[in-house]
């Protein structure tokens, strides 16, 4: 039975059935199918656990696992991933690279490839590793890309690639990620941890104790459909309870967001529209009200915080900018009336208030500031560490807020060399370059090699790398400014990509090796990313299609070419590794959780450890800040960071501040030419770019075969655009085609194209239109500030018009142009 939007939302409104006391063994992995033909197998994914009906060597049907009471409709897209026309079928080498080698950069991206054998492809891969280490050194090889990969503890493709390549020689790697780069860098200075990936106060504590919940740029109903590990969707039972409490008037929920998002439509809660990228101005005005009306918790500030006086002097306009951050000042920037700002500030202290921040808000220029300013507002309210109060930065992610059982999940395949082992090319001379770079600044390395940039209190010298190895991630999705990327990629001599789907990253590579999907190999994974509800056996559903191979096999064959296969595999097969990881996990949980022998677990497929105990974030710190200090330099909440102040940065100073953006809609810089803000948030029907290749599922939301662009009806009417029209969206960085969806969920001056839409350029030339609708064709590639150097994708303004020319075919999903 297919999962529909209606059945998904109905599931959200049901309460999850209670689990049995203690661990239980659920459901055979290979029970006979009800149809008496084929078998049913249990496996998992980022979208949840499911049973697959296998007949004649093919997946026929997918059903959610019974433990998942709120399965996502995206499970309907999994078959389309396995059998996608976009699969990488054979080892492929770019034709001009094979003919002209490193002198073929001008045609990179033309998608013309020639099929080769596995031996030929791996020989070329190894030859290039040898050449680069011999001619240049470790600074010339980048193997540190980032991505969600696929689920599974053993088959982490990045770990397999980095262990294998690392056995050959050292390489450039990265720090940070695209999702939370600014947030995870600033928050250790403020609250002592990254916060974004930390377990948060349990939903049950919030529902029981909160009077007010602020969803700030936060859309959990959309984002909790996916999880880092195999997702359980347990959060949705709490969201259903929250919906009931909102309807009864027991909890006041307010969304602060430039758009009316999916969560607000589900909860039917109040909404405060705010101009894009102006939240910090709003927050500073809230702080002004709390201070000047004497509403803030002075005792909390004095007991648990440092640097309040310096910050409040800035808010009062008594520092160098001489601007008092009044509600009237903020209203002119953020579009919220001054009286509404005062009303909001008073509401925060009217009862127990839980602030739940999203991630989209920190993916902008000066993205460190809204997270820091929000923490200061929460500190002034004075409820950090109380049940149902304080601030969280992750309740929309991977079931954060679902109580953890305390089960210690299995380890993974090691990405580093074993102790005492050295690479074949044991060279640690990086020629004065930095060996680790901020993840979002790698294109800068290609365009400005040798440039020294500030980063998090230190200096980074951008390496002049010549070769990239990319495994299981799609930088031609998650990085910004496609035309800048085209220019940069022409500087590379060799790009090797290991992938199961022919993404734009493959299009711009030289050697492409076909990995299989996670459903064509065996694995094991935690069931419930933060709840650690259980353990799931991820059974191979079908054999690897075409000539694809598991990453473990690919890298085993690569390491064999330089005599390191035995060290790489430790002499174990795939199933021996999985059993070893299980047994280590069993030992780690001895005396806490009962786990059967491996074969019994593998047959039964799922261990369920029930529910964990509720927890309150920062409660220990509040109880005794001396005994339980935060991880900040002082151990306290740092409203002012003297450490950051000593860095002397222009765009991230000693306390939260308002910085104007380089471009901004609604009267901001550049809005006279490009008046619309482009929001490129996480998609509703994908995991980033994963599942965009699933044809039938993509057809459920695409418009004329293109990615939707969501437009306010009044803005659309002014440009003669109707629902379903093709639209050209453009700015000085690029242009794309998308299909118009008119909705009043978006205010005037705001459009949305969700990230993860596959880049499909009309050709390899700079400036070519994207035929499908990748928003990163338009976004700018600049660092958030000198502190985090993180992505600033949401600092992006555009214009749009009805497309009237000859409609080009979509080029995103057809695979390579194979040249005989």
Curated annotation (Swiss-Prot):
Name the PANTHER family on file.
TRIMETHYLAMINE-N-OXIDE REDUCTASE, TRIMETHYLAMINE-N-OXIDE REDUCTASE 1
Which family does the similarity line name?
Belongs to the prokaryotic molybdopterin-containing oxidoreductase family.
Q: Where in the cell is it found?
A: Periplasm
- Known function: Reduces trimethylamine-N-oxide (TMAO) into trimethylamine; an anaerobic reaction coupled to energy-yielding reactions.
GO terms (molecular function) for this protein are: electron transfer activity; molybdenum ion binding; molybdopterin cofactor binding; trimethylamine-N-oxide reductase (cytochrome c) activity
Q: Which UniProt keywords apply?
A: Metal-binding, Molybdenum, Oxidoreductase, Periplasm, Signal
Which N-terminal stretch is annotated as signal sequence?
Answer: 1-33
Q: Give the intrachain disulfide bonds.
A: none
UniProt binding sites for Mo-bis(molybdopterin guanine dinucleotide): 179
**SUPFAM superfamilies, sorted:** ADC-like, Formate dehydrogenase/DMSO reductase, domains 1-3
Which Enzyme Commission number(s) are listed?
1.7.2.3
Presence of keyword Iron: no
Cofactor(s) this protein requires: Mo-bis(molybdopterin guanine dinucleotide)
Q: What is this protein called?
A: Trimethylamine-N-oxide reductase
Catalysed reaction equations from the record: trimethylamine + 2 Fe(III)-[cytochrome c] + H2O = trimethylamine N-oxide + 2 Fe(II)-[cytochrome c] + 3 H(+)
* Cofactor details (free text): Binds 1 molybdenum-bis(molybdopterin guanine dinucleotide) (Mo-bis-MGD) cofactor per subunit.
Major location category of this protein: periplasm
* Source organism (scientific name): Vibrio parahaemolyticus serotype O3:K6 (strain RIMD 2210633)
């Amino acid at each position: 039975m297919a999962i529909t939007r209606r059945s998904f939302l109905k599931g959200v409104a049901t309460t999850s059935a209670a689990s049995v006391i203690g661990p239980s063994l659920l459901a055979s992995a290979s029970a006979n199918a009800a149809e008496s033909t084929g078998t049913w197998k249990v496996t998992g994914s980022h979208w949840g656990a499911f049973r697959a009906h296998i007949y004649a060597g093919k997946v026929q049907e997918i059903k959610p696992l019974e433990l998942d009471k709120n399965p996502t409709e995206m499970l309907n897209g999994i078959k389309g991933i396995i059998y996608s026309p976009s699969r990488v079928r054979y080892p492929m080498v770019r034709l001009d690279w094979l003919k002209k080698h490193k002198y073929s950069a001008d045609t990179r991206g033309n998608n013309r490839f020639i099929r080769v054998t596995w031996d030929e492809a791996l020989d070329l891969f190894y030859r290039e590793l040898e050449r680069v280490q011999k001619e240049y050194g470790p600074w010339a090889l980048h193997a540190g890309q980032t991505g969600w990969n696929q689920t599974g503890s053993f088959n982490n493709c990045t770990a397999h690639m980095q262990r294998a390549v690392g056995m050959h020689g050292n390489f450039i790697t990265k720090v940070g990620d695209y999702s939370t780069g600014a947030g995870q860098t600033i928050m250790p200075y403020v609250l002592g941890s990254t916060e974004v990936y930390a377990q948060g106060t349990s939903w049950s504590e919030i529902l029981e104790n909160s009077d007010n919940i602020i969803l700030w740029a936060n859309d959990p109903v959309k984002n909790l459909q996916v999880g880092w590990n195999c997702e359980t969707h347990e959060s949705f039972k709490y969201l259903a309870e929250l919906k009931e409490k909102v309807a009864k008037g027991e909890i006041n929920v307010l969304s602060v967001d430039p758009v009316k998002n999916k969560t607000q439509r589900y909860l039917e809660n109040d909404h405060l529209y705010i101009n894009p990228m102006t939240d910090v101005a709003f927050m500073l005005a809230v702080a002004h009200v709390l201070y000047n009306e004497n509403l803030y918790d002075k005792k909390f500030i004095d007991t648990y915080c440092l640097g309040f006086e310096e910050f409040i002097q800035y808010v009062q306009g008594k520092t160098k900018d001489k601007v008092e951050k009044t509600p009237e000042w903020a209203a002119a920037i953020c579009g919220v009336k001054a009286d509404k700002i005062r009303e909001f500030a008073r509401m925060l202290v009217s009862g127990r208030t839980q602030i739940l921040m999203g991630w989209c808000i920190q993916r902008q220029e000066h993205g460190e500031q809204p997270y820091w300013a929000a923490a200061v507002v929460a500190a002034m309210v004075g409820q950090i560490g109380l049940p149902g109060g304080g601030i969280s930065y992750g309740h929309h992610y991977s079931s954060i807020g679902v109580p953890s059982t305390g089960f210690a999940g299995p380890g993974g395949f090691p990405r580093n060399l074993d102790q005492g082992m050295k690479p074949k090319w044991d060279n640690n001379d990086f020629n004065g370059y930095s060996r680790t770079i901020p993840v979002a600044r790698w294109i800068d390395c290609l365009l400005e090699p040798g440039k020294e940039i500030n980063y998090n209190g230190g200096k980074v010298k951008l390496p002049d790398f010549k070769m990239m190895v990319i495994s299981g991630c799609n930088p031609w999705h998650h990085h910004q400014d496609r035309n800048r990327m085209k220019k940069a990629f022409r500087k590379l001599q060799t790009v090797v990509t290991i992938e199961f789907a022919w993404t734009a990253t493959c299009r711009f590579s030289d050697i492409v090796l076909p990995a299989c999907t996670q459903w064509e190999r065996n694995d094991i994974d935690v069931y419930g990313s933060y709840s650690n509800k259980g353990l799931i056996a991820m059974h191979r559903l079908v054999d690897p299609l075409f000539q694809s191979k598991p990453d473990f096999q690919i890298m085993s064959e690569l390491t064999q070419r330089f005599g390191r296969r035995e060290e790489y595999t430790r002499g174990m097969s795939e199933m021996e590794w999985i059993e070893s990881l299980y047994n280590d996990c069993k030992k780690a949980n001895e005396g806490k959780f009962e786990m059967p022998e491996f074969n019994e677990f593998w047959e039964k497929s799922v261990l369920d450890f029930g529910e964990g105990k509720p927890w309150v974030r920062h409660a220990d710190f509040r109880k005794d800040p001396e005994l339980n200090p935060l991880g900040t330099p002082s151990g306290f909440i740092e409203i002012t960071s003297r450490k950051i102040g000593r860095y002397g940065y222009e765009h991230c100073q000693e306390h939260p501040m308002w910085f104007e953006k380089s471009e901004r809609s609604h009267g901001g810089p550049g809005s006279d030419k490009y008046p619309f803000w482009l929001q490129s948030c996480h998609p509703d029907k994908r995991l980033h770019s994963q599942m965009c290749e699933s044809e039938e599922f993509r057809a459920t939301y695409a418009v004329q075969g293109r990615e939707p662009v969501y437009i306010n009806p009044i803005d659309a009417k002014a440009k003669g655009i109707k629902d379903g029209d093709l639209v050209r969206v453009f700015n000085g960085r690029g242009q794309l085609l998308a299909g118009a969806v008119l909705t009043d969920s978006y205010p005037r001056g705001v459009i949305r194209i969700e990230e993860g839409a596959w880049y499909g350029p009309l050709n390899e030339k700079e400036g070519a239109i994207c035929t499908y609708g990748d928003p990163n064709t338009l976004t700018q590639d600049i660092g958030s500030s000198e502190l985090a150097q993180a992505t600033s994708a949401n600092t992006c303004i555009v214009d749009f018009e009805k497309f009237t020319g000859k409609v080009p075919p979509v080029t995103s999903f057809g695979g390579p142009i194979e040249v005989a």
